[in-house]
Amino acid sequence: MKKLLDKWISISLIKRIIGGLALGIILGLLVPKASGIALFGSVFVGALKAIAPLLVFVLVISSLCHSGKSHGGVIKTVIILYMFSTVLASVIAVFTSKLFPVTLTLTEGFEEMSSPGSIGDVFNSLLMNIVENPITSLTKANYVGILAWAVVIGIACRHAKESTKDMLVDISNGLSKVVTWIINFAPFGIMGLVFDTVSNNGMSVFKEYGKLLMLLVGTMLFIYFVTNPILVFWCTHKNPYPLVFRCLKKSALTAFFTRSSAANIPINMKECEDMGLDRDTYSVTIPLGATINMDGAAITITVMTLAAANTLGITVDIPSAILLSILAALSACGASGVAGGSLLLIPMACSLFGIPNDVAMQVVGIGFIIGVIQDSVETALNSSSDLLLSASAEFRQWRKEGREITY
């Protein structure tokens, strides 16, 4: 049994995942009624979501209480990259929406949902998440609260006994080992997730909303393969695409199927470790990115809002479009703190153009219909960009120090 397990682990993870992906598609088409297969996906995502909050909490405390040097410069660079890329994504989304305008088929039937009334509501939600009880934050996977309390406790523990610090290191190493075990289960998890998607949705989602999906996905791909590499080149002064494709394989692929930035945090952290990045830095920037680095969310909010405006015959001028870009970027940063994520921030953006709330909620309903594709690509972009930009910022520091940068 041990030999079989060792043989399994010796195979490249990406090859195992591709195998699971192919098997999931085949089973979804041949035996769509075999619902038990989907359980593998549920267990995989559940395990990642369960370990991620604890991993982030312990890693950040352990890193900060041991840290004798400042990592503020790298972290500051990462935050700037996160914010700039999100604003840039919303601006690009405005241009693509203008170049390829899309209208929507609205219906009367939709389910009323609660959405934020203003940008103030979004930031109020973020502020309340920061000061939420740390135990509650862990159980609810509130990463803003987890990060805030972990930073405070980590700084306070800098004067703790060495035995206490060593214990925290041992716990963080143990949790990292558990993450490795879970990641080795990824091929089965991906198989279950793909099976569930194919057996329940088939290809029908492409037929009715194909043009809208092409606009959303095309814009997201443009950000990942064109604008993000420019940011990487600015940091490293090297060909960015080896790093771009590494992050695509190691992070975007799993994020696409889990559809959860939180579940992908352990995977991104493991890849940062494999790249030789500083744990004191990435233990903060990766979970922070899962909260505020929301290129995909900014694109979704912008494209869906402009599609609603086109449908109602509302002309959006350049100043209004710029204002929408800023609003979408700021809103996207709070998407993780809103139930329903980016889709439920659409009504707030629609209000900028006087679009009635009932129409805006129908647009949200369309968003949920295409979510099987839109949300998957959005999460893949968001999560892989966390890894890409975190690595780029640290490589920028390496370049300044004269260290060799290898992808």
Q: What do these predicted regions represent?
A:
Residues 25, 55-62, 94, 151-155, ...:
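Transmembrane alpha-helix boundary and packing residues in multipass membrane permease domains
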Residues 47, 83-87, 91, 217-221, ...:
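Hydrophobic transmembrane alpha-helical segments of multi-pass transport and channel proteins
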